[in-house]
Structures are given as structure tokens and as C-alpha cells.
Amino acid sequence: MLRTVDLSGRSVAVKVPATSANLGPGFDTLGLALAQYDELRVSVRPEPGATVVVRGIGEGEVPTDETNLVVRAIAHTFESVGVELPGLSLVARNSIPHGRGMGSSGAAIVSGIMAAKGLLQGVADIDAQGLLALANDMEGHPDNVAPALFGGLTIAWVTPDGPRFKKLIVHRGVSPLVLVPERVMSTALARSLQPASVPHEDAVFNVSRSALLVAALIQSPELLHAATEDKLHQSYRASAMPETDRLITLLRTNGFAAVVSGAGPSILVLCSDPGQRLAAARLVATQGAAAWQPLMLAVDFKGATVPRIAEDAVSGEGDTTAV
């Protein structure tokens, strides 16, 4: 039985970063938060149901009723703490590309969960582990939502008691470049191309590279090229995104640590410094790859942010803190 709580007048603002999952060898384990953001404003309204206004990416395309992914994430969070969902008014300002492997679905889920956490402040407390569990309930893969929640580099794993994460601070020299194509890619299609099993030696190869990649990202960026080699998933998906595969091959041949971003088709290039990032962007430009939008992004270290006290957000005086 859900209890009714008076949340009249409450409003909350949320800001969630883009993410890149896998990072080459870290399939379903590693994720990186990137400084490109979706922003959300949620207010409680007297009327039941939800209204949604979407601005920016997804405007005119994503649902604007209770079936909206953000609304569903809010509802899931309220239900998890036994509180009835009030009427809601949502305004979303999106800049994370959809269907490009930059975590747009995960960002929507995290936006909703964090908005619910803000609205429920003083009513129900949800700790970091609880936030990850709620997000994983909806997304299904914690590596996709952990960096959006907590920022930085995250290692995610699943135990019998639920998903877990470890956040690490990335070396200040690491300079991500994301190359975004015009076409989209279905995550479900990308996963369907994965084999049921892989050779033992390929698994060993990826274990070594994943361990090396963590060290490269937090301590030794000069090892990024060697550390981003992969034999578990990218080659199996190449047939579904040949342009991505060709550009990654070109970049890696020229010494750049290029990998598929998430499920693709975007490419993440992990550069050891801003100069190398500029060189990678210039190489892509010389190939006539005009269809690829280069995004020179910083690593986001905060993750999702939300006002400290929900009521303060009404007057715009809320103190913004990370999870």
C-alpha cells in the first residue's frame, strides 16, 4: 500500500553527464563520465499525471506523457520507497545524442531517479548503493549508469546482493574525444551480435587489458593505446557499423586509443593530453569524414548533481551537490 505524502510546492533541478561504457576491453564493467549534459526540472503540480516538455535533442521524438523514460524512473523510485507518485511537470533540456552510444537512456533513468530523490528529501533517504540498484533495475547494466550517477571512471560489478561500484579519479592529462556519426545504433542489435562464448585466450587478453586500462586512466595515460585493445565485443559488432570500424582502424593505426563508445556507433578516443586530442581530430578531418561530429569533452568528476534541499529549488537557492 502506497502512502500519500504532501509534496506541494516542491521542485528540483538535475544535471546528468553523458557516459561512455566498455572503453574497449572493459565490456560491461568500465564506464567514464563525460562533460556533456542533460538537464531536468521537475515540479509537483496539483493535477494528477505528468506533463513533459522536451527541448533540444529528442524534441518531438520522445514521449511526453507517463511513458516517458524519465517519468517511469521517477515512478519506480517513488514506488520503491512506498510513496504515491504526485502530479508532475517536467522540463527536459537534452544535449546528449540519442542512439549513439553516449548513455542517453542511462542519463534519462538517472535524471528521473535523482529528481525523485530530491523531491523525497526529508521523506525517504536513498543512499548511493540504493541509487545504483534502482538505476540498474531499469537499465540492466550497471556500467552504463554508474558513471552518470557518480562521475569519473567507474568499475561496476554484480553480486547476489545487487550491483556494486568503485569510483576512481582520472588522470588530469586524459583528454576524451568523441566522434559522433549521423546514424544511430540499437543497443539490442549490438548485443545480439555477441557470441554465446569466446575463446579462453581472448578472455585472458581482455582481463590483462582491462587491468592495464584502469592503471592507464588513473596514473599512466601513455599506456592508453595498448590498454584499449579488445577481443571480446568490438570485432563481433563491426559488421553492423562498418564506418565506425574503419575509422577506429585508421585512428589506432596512427597511434590513437580509439574504441567504440558504448554500443556505438560513436567512437571514443582516449588521448593522453589535449595536443594528442587535437591531432586525432585533425586526422579525422583530413579523411573527409564530415559526417562525424567531433566533441572535445572533459571528464566529468561529479556525476549527477541535484539541489541539497528540494524546497530551495523553487526559489533557485538550492545548493548543488554531487551524489
Curated annotation (Swiss-Prot):
Keyword Transmembrane helix annotated = no
Cross-referenced HAMAP family: Homoser_kinase (MF_00384)
What does the entry give for GO biological process? threonine biosynthetic process
Q: Which SUPFAM superfamilies does the entry mention?
A: GHMP Kinase, C-terminal domain, Ribosomal protein S5 domain 2-like
The Gene Ontology CC terms held by the record are: cytoplasm
Please give the pathway this protein is involved in. Answer: Amino-acid biosynthesis; L-threonine biosynthesis; L-threonine from L-aspartate: step 4/5
Instruction: Please tell me where this protein is predominantly located.
Output: cytoplasm
Q: Which NCBIfam families match?
A: thrB (TIGR00191)
Stated name of the protein: Homoserine kinase
> Which InterPro entries does the entry link to?
GHMP_kinase_C_dom (IPR013750), GHMP_kinase_C_sf (IPR036554), GHMP_kinase_N_dom (IPR006204), GHMP_knse_ATP-bd_CS (IPR006203), Homoserine_kinase (IPR000870), Ribosomal_Su5_D2-typ_SF (IPR020568), Ribsml_uS5_D2-typ_fold_subgr (IPR014721)
Instruction: Tell me the gene name.
Output: thrB
Q: Which reaction does it catalyse?
A: L-homoserine + ATP = O-phospho-L-homoserine + ADP + H(+)
